[in-house]
């Protein structure tokens, strides 16, 4: 017999549905994601730390879950909100149903609610704090109180919470349909040594760097610039991650040192915002952010439109860009800044996710540009 669940927003709106995950209470910022596929990649993306994810596509769970599709070692989203959970997961790769997957990691989830209504509320009022309660004791008053108590993501440094505790090497390339996940590559196949800061890095980013010949040393978020320079890298990568970039002063200061030393730097998502802050720009909290795999972005240099994967609630403010930063990409949804490039240093960044997972690969050539900068710097 299905257990009940409820979602309460901080404005007092209540949604009643059925539990599809673990029993318990979960609090976070409620956001909506418009991706039709890739729910497992979304749930395991560390960028969703302290967020409750609403998926707007009505049927979620059709393909079950598989360990090969995880973007990190565990689910980082605080909870999941969907319209309908299919009774059958049809996929030859599936290892576990979505419901069992949520329960195995003690994640709450709610289904059978009007996700279109919820999305309209978030779109019109902005991202709200919320609380999911699942199980036998559904206390609306308690849920509302907990939603109102949640401090919100502005000013919250989450990168140091989700980062790796110790540095490690990564040499595994991308998954293929024919071979699955490959064995680690030999150093002879990886001519470029790149230090990757883990602010909440997705595995597919690391794999796409390896595909292009990068031998990765992945380091904790608070690793000093001096420790990184001692590794003698050919380039530095700044990963995606959750929370507000402004409190990440350790990363901002380290990035300033890399820029002063002329090292090639490539940032994605939070890493993009870190590069902007290190270069003198400012960041802002967005009304409801960008979350989905169908976002059109204009490449200003090539005058073409890309369809991209997005997941961010903060953005670099184009109005604050200093003279040494030029805009390279803008969102065609709201005109917000999507990409920057230093005019005086081999450093650039992109707000979206060129590694996709899930999503299109239109922006994947950005990885190639990073390799070009490394080659030019090494010449």
From Swiss-Prot:
<keyword id="KW-0028">Amino-acid biosynthesis</keyword>
<keyword id="KW-0547">Nucleotide-binding</keyword>
<dbReference type="GO" id="GO:0006207">
    <property type="term" value="P:'de novo' pyrimidine nucleobase biosynthetic process"/>
</dbReference>
<dbReference type="InterPro" id="IPR017926">
    <property type="entry name" value="GATASE"/>
</dbReference>
<dbReference type="InterPro" id="IPR035686">
    <property type="entry name" value="CPSase_GATase1"/>
</dbReference>
<dbReference type="InterPro" id="IPR029062">
    <property type="entry name" value="Class_I_gatase-like"/>
</dbReference>
<comment type="similarity">
    <text>Belongs to the CarA family.</text>
</comment>
<feature type="binding site">
    <location>
        <position position="311"/>
    </location>
    <ligand>
        <name>L-glutamine</name>
    </ligand>
</feature>
<feature type="active site" description="Nucleophile">
    <location>
        <position position="269"/>
    </location>
</feature>
<dbReference type="InterPro" id="IPR002474">
    <property type="entry name" value="CarbamoylP_synth_ssu_N"/>
</dbReference>
<comment type="pathway">
    <text>Amino-acid biosynthesis; L-arginine biosynthesis; carbamoyl phosphate from bicarbonate: step 1/1.</text>
</comment>
<feature type="binding site">
    <location>
        <position position="313"/>
    </location>
    <ligand>
        <name>L-glutamine</name>
    </ligand>
</feature>
<feature type="active site">
    <location>
        <position position="355"/>
    </location>
</feature>
<keyword id="KW-0665">Pyrimidine biosynthesis</keyword>
<dbReference type="Pfam" id="PF00117">
    <property type="entry name" value="GATase"/>
</dbReference>
<comment type="subunit">
    <text>Composed of two chains; the small (or glutamine) chain promotes the hydrolysis of glutamine to ammonia, which is used by the large (or ammonia) chain to synthesize carbamoyl phosphate. Tetramer of heterodimers (alpha,beta)4.</text>
</comment>
<dbReference type="Pfam" id="PF00988">
    <property type="entry name" value="CPSase_sm_chain"/>
</dbReference>
<dbReference type="GO" id="GO:0004359">
    <property type="term" value="F:glutaminase activity"/>
</dbReference>
<keyword id="KW-0067">ATP-binding</keyword>
<comment type="function">
    <text>Small subunit of the glutamine-dependent carbamoyl phosphate synthetase (CPSase). CPSase catalyzes the formation of carbamoyl phosphate from the ammonia moiety of glutamine, carbonate, and phosphate donated by ATP, constituting the first step of 2 biosynthetic pathways, one leading to arginine and/or urea and the other to pyrimidine nucleotides. The small subunit (glutamine amidotransferase) binds and cleaves glutamine to supply the large subunit with the substrate ammonia.</text>
</comment>
<dbReference type="GO" id="GO:0044205">
    <property type="term" value="P:'de novo' UMP biosynthetic process"/>
</dbReference>
<protein>
    <recommendedName>
        <fullName>Carbamoyl phosphate synthase small chain</fullName>
        <ecNumber>6.3.5.5</ecNumber>
    </recommendedName>
</protein>
<feature type="binding site">
    <location>
        <position position="270"/>
    </location>
    <ligand>
        <name>L-glutamine</name>
    </ligand>
</feature>
<feature type="region of interest" description="CPSase">
    <location>
        <begin position="1"/>
        <end position="189"/>
    </location>
</feature>
<dbReference type="GO" id="GO:0004088">
    <property type="term" value="F:carbamoyl-phosphate synthase (glutamine-hydrolyzing) activity"/>
</dbReference>
<feature type="binding site">
    <location>
        <position position="314"/>
    </location>
    <ligand>
        <name>L-glutamine</name>
    </ligand>
</feature>
<dbReference type="InterPro" id="IPR006274">
    <property type="entry name" value="CarbamoylP_synth_ssu"/>
</dbReference>
<feature type="binding site">
    <location>
        <position position="241"/>
    </location>
    <ligand>
        <name>L-glutamine</name>
    </ligand>
</feature>
<feature type="binding site">
    <location>
        <position position="243"/>
    </location>
    <ligand>
        <name>L-glutamine</name>
    </ligand>
</feature>
<feature type="domain" description="Glutamine amidotransferase type-1">
    <location>
        <begin position="193"/>
        <end position="379"/>
    </location>
</feature>
<dbReference type="GO" id="GO:0005524">
    <property type="term" value="F:ATP binding"/>
</dbReference>
<dbReference type="GO" id="GO:0006526">
    <property type="term" value="P:L-arginine biosynthetic process"/>
</dbReference>
<comment type="pathway">
    <text>Pyrimidine metabolism; UMP biosynthesis via de novo pathway; (S)-dihydroorotate from bicarbonate: step 1/3.</text>
</comment>
<dbReference type="InterPro" id="IPR050472">
    <property type="entry name" value="Anth_synth/Amidotransfase"/>
</dbReference>
<dbReference type="InterPro" id="IPR036480">
    <property type="entry name" value="CarbP_synth_ssu_N_sf"/>
</dbReference>
<feature type="binding site">
    <location>
        <position position="47"/>
    </location>
    <ligand>
        <name>L-glutamine</name>
    </ligand>
</feature>
<feature type="binding site">
    <location>
        <position position="273"/>
    </location>
    <ligand>
        <name>L-glutamine</name>
    </ligand>
</feature>
<keyword id="KW-0436">Ligase</keyword>
<keyword id="KW-0055">Arginine biosynthesis</keyword>
<dbReference type="GO" id="GO:0006541">
    <property type="term" value="P:glutamine metabolic process"/>
</dbReference>
<feature type="active site">
    <location>
        <position position="353"/>
    </location>
</feature>
<keyword id="KW-0315">Glutamine amidotransferase</keyword>
